[in-house]
Regions:
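Autoinhibitory N-terminal propeptides
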Residues: 12-13, 26-147, 154-155, 163, ...
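Polar, glycine-rich mid-to-C-terminal structural blocks
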Residues: 304-390
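Bacterial N-terminal signal peptides
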Residues: 15-24
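Bacterial N-terminal signal peptides that target proteins for export
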Residues: 5-16
């Protein structure tokens, strides 16, 4: 189908947040904003088109503000953000979580004292034998340790969704002493809903999102459940808890961790915060702003634990390692209710561009309906739109592609957001080819 000549391929890492991938034949250049993340550019495009009903956009805006990470180039950046009407929330060094007025995102990113703006992205939630395989019983007994460890005197923090404050697991083993010290409910429609007393917590009963999700209750039980009236207990069942019901936006999650650490410090207690959530987006090398900020928060008496995830049997990640092959894969969606999808592709080595080809494929006729041909990231516009029609002309597919040479690790990146038109039945219609080489490859 394509002819590849004398190609030198490097390894490519491909992270897939499964949904769908749309390709097309028309190549239209869009405005480029070099100090905005690809995801931020996509959201601004939707704002410009007044596509406020789009679920991708709704998940990243808070009222009239865009939730984002901002890295300043100089200390003057903080005053400039304030002057622009921004709300600085959590700050670690030169990076902060910030609410930026929607009307000011472009102007803020253009300031010389601002180095980079990265819009907040949605994350997803990620066992009665967990204690056994983690050797918790030995820690409880103090086996080969200076003392037993049960969590007593420690704060267990959890940032998650769907929290039931009244659950029996959040009392002690006898079901008498209530162990949740306080909660911040980010999902509440009220500004900063905090509950700081047992009476307030039991009166509130649960977080505002608990009618559709109970993941946080489940996770907190594993981490710190008291085991009242059951043989099953959490890992640190004598600890106290500070919980944050989160919106699942990564900048809000950072704010939640910061809140728990600061409140634990106020109480004079060591703290472990659990994050049983994640996504498939990013370079997976510790250079995204969420990773940097969380890394800066930890230290003596402040630990963060992260779940391994639930994606082992899901095709959400692949890589091209062979020097004599080209990655070719269909990209499908895991949830047919989704109207959009995201694909994030990274070069494995700094300074090495890679090439991509997108096909629109009809399975019934076994034909390629349209193709972009191979294009290289070092020659394509940073912002591009591809469109194509289905064979009968009733459906229009669109993919918005945002590329960058990420300044914080020197690696080329292609981030794609694609729209899934209503009525598409073929779940394997989008065929992706990825290859790297020293010169552009064309098919």
């Amino acid at each position: 189908m394509e002819k590849m000549v004398n190609m030198k391929r490097k390894s490519i890492l491909l992270s897939l947040l499964l949904a769908i991938f749309v390709v097309g034949g028309m190549f239209a250049q869009e405005p480029t904003y070099s100090k905005m993340s690809p995801y931020t550019r996509i959201l601004l495009d939707k704002l410009a088109k007044k596509d406020t009903a789009n679920s991708l956009l709704r998940s990243s805006i808070s009222g009239d503000y865009l939730s984002a990470f901002v890295k300043v180039a100089t200390d003057e950046g903080w005053a400039s953000l304030d002057s622009a009407g921004c709300r600085i929330r959590t700050r670690t060094g030169d990076i902060a979580t910030v609410l930026i007025p929607l009307s000011a995102v472009e102007s803020v990113s253009g300031l010389g004292c601002i180095q980079y703006v990265s819009a907040s992205q949605p994350m997803r939630a990620s066992m009665d034998s967990a204690r056994y395989y983690s050797d918790v019983a030995d820690a409880y007994a103090g086996t080969k340790l200076p003392q037993p460890y049960t969590g007593k005197g420690v704060i267990v923090g959890v940032v998650d969704q769907g929290l039931d404050f009244t659950h029996p697991n959040f009392y002690d083993k006898e079901g008498k002493a209530y162990r949740i010290k306080q909660v911040w409910d980010q999902t509440s429609p009220y500004s900063k809903a905090e509950y700081r007393t047992e009476e307030e917590l039991l009166d509130a009963a649960c977080s505002f999102d608990s009618d559709v999700n109970t993941h946080g209750t489940h996770v907190t039980g594993i981490a710190a459940g008291g085991g009242f009236d059951t043989p099953y207990q959490g890992v640190a069942n004598e600890s106290d808890m500070i919980l944050v019901a989160t919106t699942m936006q990564n900048s809000d999650i950072v704010d939640g961790v910061d809140y728990i650490f600061k409140e634990s410090e106020r109480l004079g207690r060591p703290c472990v915060v659990n994050l049983s959530l994640g996504d498939g987006i990013g370079g997976h090398d510790g250079t995204n702003f969420m990773d940097i900020m969380l890394d800066r928060m930890v230290g003596p008496g402040k630990i963060i634990t992260v779940a391994m995830g639930n994606s082992r049997d899901m095709p959400v990640y692949t890589e091209l390692m062979s020097p004599s092959d080209t990655l070719r894969t269909f990209v499908g969606r895991s949830n047919t209710g989704l109207s959009y999808g995201l694909v994030d592709i990274w070069a494995d080595e700094p300074g090495e561009p890679f090439s991509v080809c997108l096909d629109l494929y009809d399975r019934e006729s076994d034909e390629i309906l349209n193709t972009t041909g191979f294009f290289a990231l070092d020659t394509m516009p940073k912002s591009s739109v591809f469109t194509s029609e289905s064979m009968d002309g009733t459906l229009v597919y669109e993919a918005r592609m945002e590329s960058e040479l990420y300044v914080f690790n020197g690696r080329y990146r292609l981030f794609i957001q694609f729209n899934y038109p209503e009525g598409t039945k073929n779940e394997k219609i989008f065929l992706l080819h990825v290859a790297t080489n020293n010169t552009p490859v064309r098919a």
